[in-house]
Structure formats: C-alpha cells, structure tokens
Amino acid sequence: MLHPDFLTRPLTHRGLHGLGVPENSMAAFRAAVAQGYGIELDVQPAADGTPLVFHDYGLGRLAGRDGVISALSPAEAGATRLLGTNEAIPTLEAVLGMVAGRAPVLVEIKDQDGSLGPRMGALPGRVAEIVAACHAQGEPVAVMSFNPHAAAGVRAAAPDVPIGLTSCRFDRDDWTGIPEARRAALSRLEDFPRVGASFISHHHQDLGNPPVGRLAAQGVPVLCWTIRSPAEEAAARGVARNITFEGYRPQAG
C-alpha cells in the first residue's frame, strides 16, 4: 500500500525546479523537501546499469551535448553539468539517501524497450533493490512506469514495495510504433491487476476515462500528472487524490 504521505503532500514534477535549478537535480529535490512537498523523479540506466535520475534518453536538452544517458558511467554522469549550473546528474541511491524519508518519493522507471514491451533489461531489478532498502526503513517510496513490464519486474524483485502504472490516453501521435490494440489495452489499464499495481498516476486531462473511475470507486489511489495551475488542480481533484505539479506552488500537505 502507498504511504499516506503520497495522498497528502503534492508531488513536485522532477523536483521543485525553476530558473537556475534544473529538473531532476539535487537542488530541485532539496527545495521540494524544504517546502514540504513530495517528489516525483525519473530513472534511466547508466552504462553499467546504475539507476540515474534523468528523464530524457538524449543529453542534448539538459546537458547541451550529443550522446545518450545510457552510455555514461556513473562517474561521467556525476561530472555532467545540467543547464549550465553546477548541478550534475545524480544516482537514485544518492537522491534517496539525501531525502532520507523526509518526503515521499515516487520513482518513474523510463521505458527501455522502445515499445513498452518486455525488454527492460536489469533496470527494474536495480531500482527494486535500492527502493526496497528504503521501504524497509519505513521511508515513503513507490515505483511506477508507463511500461507494465517494468512495474511487474519491481514487484517480482521487491514484493513489499508499492508499484503503480503511469497512464494516459496513449494517443497514436504520442506513442508511435505501438500497435493500436496495445495502446487501447494500455488506456483501459488492463495490466493493472496482472502486475499487482496498487495505484495509478494518470494524465489529468483524461481523468474521466471510465477505467480510471472504476479503479477510484474500488478505493484505488488515483494520482495525476502534470498540473500547472490552481484551476487545473481544482478540476483534477474531483477524481485524483493527489497531484504531480510544476510551474506554481500548491498548498503543501
């Protein structure tokens, strides 16, 4: 089950980032903790499989250079500066060690298959090992992914860690290369019981999706992403029990 903090403390989207504070950086996560918010972050593998906290597959947008995150060693990631600041790409273990249970941390495993298929490599198991150690200490942690195979991998390796599905309409234009039938099944959340999920984080503009409502009626915690204004928050909270946000400051739980 999700720790209660996941339902009471709004989750910063990639930390509390802004001017001079890059997303998914230690500075963004420290700011979130200081303001009483929770944290949502993204995980990609380093060349040796170490879970790194980084959203994109390529380095261009945040590091200003060519290359892919999965080609970096942890040391190279730690020497890669983000958006011209002194902030570098952190490891998941370092972030969780810094937070130390002071805020709920929702870890999103990025797809490694390319089509939300089973080729996730060792990343789910590596994430599970790190997160399970925190969970065993009573720290509020959970893991989710758009890829149900990633969620299932964490569940198999760490059965006590809460897992969820990141979800949306899975529109064709946003999810090219995934067959229509599979996209439809994903939008209907058909994998939810199979993978042993205990929550979802759904796109805020699709909270009226009937499968979302059915899960909510069953008492399944519905979170949502990504809220960018008080008006969007007010609309989302008609269904969602908590939000992932950026660009404004909601009331901290």
Predicted feature residues:
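Phosphate-group recognition and catalysis centered on beta-loop-alpha active-site segments
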Residues: 1-253
